[in-house]
């Protein structure tokens, strides 16, 4: 296992592996159109990066793709009723559907979260980073929505269920951020220090964003 050097130690260089949008279910095709890359493809990308012996890795958001558009399950093929029916039935059978009237951590909703996270995070990463420290930071899709702004739907700022679903998923599957403003393990903000060679802040800029007037913000003090 690899650990970090003392924050005040002299370090000549640091190598960082960084990537984004690794989430999504197992890749599939419909009518020749590809939806997501196969897990094996993504794992080959990981292997290529790890072969360069990085000192640590940062996974920048979109650890999952499960956009609900305010509903209980993804509205796949919403413009085609037949596709929506068949894919919706398949998703409900394999993964289950959320009950938004309950907390995201309820027994029913937690089962759905685990079905999603086991495929898109646990099965993807496995133990590949066991010897390389890795940090997760969330983005819009980790709140179970794309950052859409349409006439009939504006997905952000995230609603209470989306925030709760993110928190539950992060607590189940994310490695914690340990160097935080209040010294408590966090999921949305943290500092990375690698000796005296590197110091950087990583923060969630999606989940707590607000819109309008001079008080609009991206990063909440509550993080």
What role is predicted for each listed range?
Residues 1-223:
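Metal-dependent phosphoester/phosphodiester hydrolase catalytic core
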